[in-house]
Regions:
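Short amphipathic alpha-helical segments, especially helix-boundary/capping motifs
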Residues: 13, 32-33, 44-45, 51-54, ...
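A hydrophobic/aromatic-rich effector-binding and dimerization subdomain
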Residues: 2-19, 38-39, 108-176
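Amphipathic, well-ordered alpha-helical segments in soluble domains
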Residues: 69, 166-170, 192, 196-199
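Short, Lys/Arg-enriched, Trp-marked, Pro/Gly-tolerant hinge/linker segments that flank
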Residues: 157-161, 178-191, 198-213
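N-terminal regulatory/effector-sensing and dimerization cores
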Residues: 46-140, 146-148, 182-186
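Proline-rich intrinsically disordered, low-complexity coils
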Residues: 26, 36, 59-61, 154, ...
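Generic protein-terminus/edge-of-domain signal
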Residues: 1-77, 137
Length: 213
């Protein structure tokens, strides 16, 4: 665990530049355009899951995705503007965003470690999602909205740390497998993703955090 924490706190080259200037340094050429739309081709080269750390020390501009995105606050806190509204996330919180969600991230400081977990839509089994707490599952509606005629008022979910007590340990294992590759790491990541989705579905309250109107 300490090895992973030390690794994530190491400053990347982009972070070093942003720390000096306080200005955003694009990590992809597509980010140089206004409100860019990031596509699958940028991330999923012969892999099913993409995990990265958000670069600190400068705001990350407004952008949208062509894939499902999970933000995990590994340490510290994070302020994001999602679809025009500001939210603050703290250590252990998760933000799950559907395809087309637009968000920007305020400047992260030294102790603010935010992890991105991106996965292709076609890697999620429709059959397994149908079993996730039935049709009342908010996660089910969120992930399947493109495959049905459902209309949702928002296309993201925030889960607080107290609602997902078992998820951090699972995510830490996935992050370790991703950055410290060993035999069968890719297979472990694939299966861990399914378990992660079930844990998230289990944690979703039935009535308190409705996103469907």
């Amino acid at each position: 665990m300490q090895l992973l924490t030390d690794f994530l706190h190491q400053e990347t080259e982009i972070e070093k530049q942003q720390k000096k200037t306080g200005s955003f340094v694009p990590d992809f050429s597509e980010m140089k355009t206004q409100a860019p739309h990031l596509t699958n081709d940028l991330f999923f080269h012969n892999r099913d899951i993409y995990i990265s750390k958000h670069n600190r020390y400068a705001p990350y501009p407004l952008h949208s995705h062509q894939f499902l995105e999970l933000n995990y606050i590994y340490s510290g806190h994070c302020q994001q503007i999602i679809n025009g509204q500001t939210y603050t996330l703290y250590q252990g919180d998760i933000l799950l965003m559907d395809v087309g969600s637009k968000h920007q991230i305020e400047c992260l400081e030294e102790e603010d470690i935010v992890i991105n977990l991106l996965f292709k839509d076609n890697n999620i089994s429709l059959q397994s999602l149908e079993e996730m707490q039935g049709n009342n599952s908010l996660l089910y509606h969120l992930l399947l909205s493109r495959h049905s005629h459902l209309e949702i008022s928002q296309n993201f979910i925030i889960l607080r740390s107290e609602e997902i007590p078992k998820v951090p340990q699972l995510l830490h294992r996935m992050i370790e497998e991703y950055f410290f590759q060993k035999d069968f790491s890719q297979e472990i990541l694939k299966h861990s993703l399914s378990i992660l989705l079930y844990e998230l579905a289990r944690s979703l309250p039935n009535a308190q955090k409705k996103i469907l109107q």
